[in-house]
Amino acid sequence: MKERVLLSWSSGKDSAWALHEIRSADEVEVVGLLTTVTEPFDRVSMHGVRRQILQAQAAAAGLPLTEVMIPSPCPNEIYEARMVSAMDVAREDGIRTVAFGDLFLEDIRAYREANLAKVSMTAIFPLWQKPTPDLAAAMVGGGLRAIIVCVDPRQLDASFAGRFYDASFLNDLPDDVDPCGE
């Protein structure tokens, strides 16, 4: 029997591709998505995606969704307490691992691993340190469909928001902008 894992779901392309990679590798079984939703806005905390879209994504993936509601602003103590509660429920269901779509940020990885260790759980990172030009090409070539919902205006013109994440989008990116938004 395969190990059962939750996938931390930001509602973005990296989470979607992490799900694809995990399913393709066929070593563990993703049994649910885990997402933080900011209470006053009723949106995914990471990307600001509406909750209805989040729920449609989970349905399209064929996976149950665990929504961890957090306030805004959310002090770390509240965030961590609510995540511990969600992990307690997951552990009761026999889940001991959470997968993340993170690519590079060592401090975020260490934070996730340390918090999971406190509740006797582990983390996996299927996209970790993959070269982003290769990863972007694999996503587009593999049929991933995504729409850019936010951009950093210090890095990229606002006109890129609302575009499909496709070969045309990647070709139009300035050379100094990471194709995965890192």
Residue ranges and their predicted role:
Residues 1-182:
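Nucleotide-activated chemistry modules centered on ATP-dependent adenylation/adenylyltransferase
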